[in-house]
């Protein structure tokens, strides 16, 4: 019983077209014959009968072939009676399947038999109706199923391409329209837009408008576009480029003015601002001092002391920082031809640091490569005019190499209201201090 049911089930499942890889039963020769014979609608019912008969014998493949041939003969002999042949096969399968097993358990396996046997015919019915050979109908059945997705797959990319083409066309058309202005970014990188050539009249009008207003409002832009026969986009982009150019020019001018403003402020030393301060500027900027002829005191720069003796106190505040006591300079031979005193600080260190004002807040001053100190016991010492020509002509060296009197100049003490100066007749050459730079310790 169990074996019979097992064989029946195997036969039923063997009749399924899903048992083999090609979609047909293991007995490849079993189905073509009933399929080829069953050209009518009733052939669908004969094939399960044969399939049920072939497993009922429980034989090997040769017996199955014989049974299939017998079924073929029985089915092919009376093709003129399809309804009579179509009805009995529905009923005979129970008696054919009944002998192998007793009747009580038979109803249990039998109901599953028609139910599984019923589904195969519709699945395999479509191929036999299309052609006589099963392999070709199977391929034909598979081909539409396969062709439809492939066709759909071929259609979808084509549709996408068409959409992309339409998008590209629209973008190219829009870019072409906007390229009429020759300023719009092209739709594709390959296509280069032409450079806009403005006429001189257009440039003049644009420059005029930019001169009055760097940022253009839309109404004015529309008006200018109509006036100059340009597009708004062209005018807008021209103004953008012009503003960038203007900023660049302003930045360049700012750099030039800043550098030019610094260099003139440093290079020319303002006269009469103070001895050491001016000397610092002159030394930093390396302004060479051009030694003049021995009588430079008749042509002194502004704020120097080479003026008549009456103007010494007036010219003092403009030449040096205000000293604690007012310093007066006395001339030895003021009446002798009106020649002013020898003033070693006529050019207060504006040259190369050889002369300086020896009275800035009582600090020692480096004069002519040496320090000058006063004679404290002589009161307000006067310069000897007898030695002035000699000192100014021969002994004076503006480069600081002249053999001037050595010594130190001390600031006015509490008992010395006026600074005094040594008589520069003693030509003691200062050893080792001729090329020495001034020591600016008070700044």
Curated annotation (Swiss-Prot):
Its main location: nucleus. Residues 187-196, 256-266 have a biased composition (Polar residues). InterPro entries: DUF4074 (IPR025281), HD (IPR001356), HD_metazoa (IPR020479), Homeobox_Antennapedia_CS (IPR001827), Homeobox_CS (IPR017970), Homeodomain-like_sf (IPR009057). GO terms for cellular component: chromatin; nucleoplasm; nucleus. Residues 191-250 bind DNA. A motif (Antp-type hexapeptide) lies at residues 155-160. Coiled coil: none annotated. GO terms for molecular function: DNA-binding transcription factor activity, RNA polymerase II-specific; HMG box domain binding; RNA polymerase II cis-regulatory region sequence-specific DNA binding. The keyword Glycosyltransferase does not apply. Residues 79-125 have a biased composition (Pro residues). Keywords: Developmental protein, DNA-binding, Homeobox, Nucleus, Transcription, Transcription regulation. GO terms for biological process: angiogenesis; animal organ formation; anterior/posterior pattern specification; blood vessel remodeling; cartilage development; embryonic skeletal system morphogenesis; gene expression; glossopharyngeal nerve morphogenesis. Residues 126-141, 308-318 have a biased composition (Low complexity). Residues 75-147, 159-196, 247-338, 400-443 are annotated as: Disordered. This is Homeobox protein Hox-A3. It comes from Homo sapiens (Human). The gene is HOXA3.
